[in-house]
Amino acid sequence: MKIGIIGAMEPEVAHLIASMTDTQTQTIAGIEFVAGQLEGKEVIVTRSGIGKVTASVATTLLIEKYAPDYVINTGSAGGFVDSLAIGDIVISSEVRHHDVDVTAFGYEIGQMAQQPAAFMPDRTLVEAAKKAVADLGEVKAIEGLICTGDSFICDPERTKVMLNNFPTMAACEMEGAAIAQVCHQFKVPFVVIRSLSDNANNDSPVDFDSYLVKAGHHSALMVISLLKHL
């Protein structure tokens, strides 16, 4: 079994890479891929960079070069669920773009033309992630809708619009739907797992800077535990 793991920033992948053995590193198009062993599985970890375009490039290169059986997107997100605290985790039940609008042509809000409205994660990965929750002690995890866009959300007015469009949204971030869309086109099973670094409000920039390392570490621990259950 070969598993690709994608995080946008160094704090989101650092613990994973430090936990790997027998590593080999290759850089393609400025993106570093670290292949090795983790929890008895063959894994490839990459730091994609921030945003949907860089995430799409990294995912395409990962799939074309390494042919993983599964892809896991790990990292931080802004939270929209009152019962979750910073550091808690959202496991994707579905993934959508929140900044796409081609409704003039009959598509749903958030649906890219000629693509599904929602990208559905692999249930084997989701169930393994849910089993992994027990390994994380007091960290809480839920399964929910994760939305993606090329903006850092900290404006209450934008938050209202997003929640009006996606009332069940549990978290938002900047890469997941792009990764999911590439996986969909290549028919590679995926899951998005995000730890909350902020609550998508006026305090988000301060919270994000303060809690990114914590969120990245929690998400990485979740991924490592998930691997044990595959």
From Swiss-Prot:
InterPro entries: MTA_SAH_Nsdase, Nucleoside_phosphorylase_d, Nucleoside_phosphorylase_sf. CDD domains: MTAN. SUPFAM superfamilies: Purine and uridine phosphorylases (SSF53167). It catalyses: S-adenosyl-L-homocysteine + H2O = S-(5-deoxy-D-ribos-5-yl)-L-homocysteine + adenine; S-methyl-5'-thioadenosine + H2O = 5-(methylsulfanyl)-D-ribose + adenine; 5'-deoxyadenosine + H2O = 5-deoxy-D-ribose + adenine. The keyword S-adenosyl-L-methionine does not apply. The active site is at 12 (proton acceptor), 198 (proton donor). Substrate binds at residues 78, 153, 174-175. This is 5'-methylthioadenosine/S-adenosylhomocysteine nucleosidase. It comes from Shewanella loihica (strain ATCC BAA-1088 / PV-4).
